[in-house]
Amino acid sequence: MAALYACTKCHQRFPFEALSQGQQLCKECRIAHPVVKCTYCRTEYQQESKTNTICKKCAQNVQLYGTPKPCQYCNIIAAFIGNKCQRCTNSEKKYGPPYSCEQCKQQCAFDRKDDRKKVDGKLLCWLCTLSYKRVLQKTKEQRKHLSSSSRAGHQEKEQYSRLSGGGHYNSQKTLSTSSIQNEIPKKKSKFESITTNGDSFSPDLALDSPGTDHFVIIAQLKEEVATLKKMLHQKDQMILEKEKKITELKADFQYQESQMRAKMNQMEKTHKEVTEQLQAKNRELLKQAAALSKSKKSEKSGAITSP
């Protein structure tokens, strides 16, 4: 009897082949609790419900610190404290200021001073490194699947040749040799056409390359789409910030304009009041001057008539 192994989620026992490699989950648990990326920190986690789109750590941080902001380095919406996410904060303390990622061109790649930590000699950020490793893993699985299928087909051909035997052996031998001779130039021409395109593949990889190349191209296109989405999100954030700044400047300008108008109105009112006061004072002085001149004239006329 074959050994049975427990699922890490439902704890029911299944054959080893029925469980997933990483999480050791059965088929039903894999469907009910898929591995998804957190909306905030972009790490993979086991989804408990369809409505839950963030991991447990981010859920706790949301309760403690509120909704996060985009990190000023990696642009991931995971900056709960300050303007940087926890990953970039720790990396900056450990490795110094960030450098430009050679894939997404963002200022979020940290140099660990170790060439073994680089990906094909390139300095990549955390997200681009994960994407590259996923592509390599999928390519490796695809090649393993292709090699196993070709090996199974070869074994079936050998079994068929053993069972056929007898008088058909010589005819099959001549047919097989002629078919092999006919197929060798085709494979050779195929390999030459691949190598002339500038690719340096070995013959074994050249025979298995079409499906693998298509898979790698699809994976690269997906990563490029993700990168473009990230850049688009970054541009949208920049546009929103600029629009916010323009709105603030407009509001400040309107406030200053209203203050200036109020000040001008107040100055005009004050000037009008001062002018009216001066005019009233001037009229009063003119009256006093007229009265003085009149009294002087009367005094002079009285002095003349008195002798």
Curated annotation (Swiss-Prot):
Region feature Disordered, mapped onto this chain: 142-195, 287-307
Record keyword Coiled coil present: yes
InterPro entries (alphabetical): FAM76 (IPR032017)
Keyword Hydrolase: no
Cellular-component GO terms for this entry: nuclear speck; nucleoplasm
Coiled-coil boundaries: 217-299
UniProt family annotation: Belongs to the FAM76 family.
Name of the protein in its database record: Protein FAM76A
Species whose genome carries this gene: Homo sapiens
